[in-house]
């Protein structure tokens, strides 16, 4: 199930992902939980979240390589401001015995600003938000409020990010 931050967003082996465009670098990122309407420690969300990410760029596109997939986004005309979105539907429980299953839509939104408009990006700052909502026709009442789940749907949480390039020469 790809809802928990620590599970489905495993940033373990970032080097293994393919890197389109020009390499900006590998970044050590610290995320601080800014707000959550999902509940305390919902989905494994902690107050501090440390991970690594590789960033590349090609023209006005930015690529966020987390070790499991490559997410693409856009860089604004200033060459520094970026945004990346992705959506995934996750089946929590299958339908059965006269009852619909529980399917949750998770939307990830990353927004930020690179320290440089070229290829020498030493750092970036931004936010990473996760939004969760039950898909129409789903019944998630057994899951909502259970251990490690969310307190209510829809809900969201947001981390403020501070990323520093790990090696000064990319």
Give, region by region, the residue ranges found by the protein language model.
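N-terminal helix-cap/turn-to-beta initiation motif at the start of protein domains
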Residues: 11-28, 166-170
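Residues that flank catalytic or metal-binding motifs in active/ligand-binding sites
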Residues: 23, 51, 69, 157-159
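Predominantly extracellular/secreted and cell-surface proteins with exposed
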Residues: 33, 41-132
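C-terminal motif of bacterial Sec signal peptides marking the signal peptidase cleavage site
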Residues: 4-7
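Tryptophan-anchored aromatic micro-motifs
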Residues: 19-47
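Secreted/processed peptides and extracellular or luminal domains of membrane proteins
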Residues: 14, 44-46, 107-109, 146, ...
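Edge beta-strand at a domain terminus
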Residues: 128-170
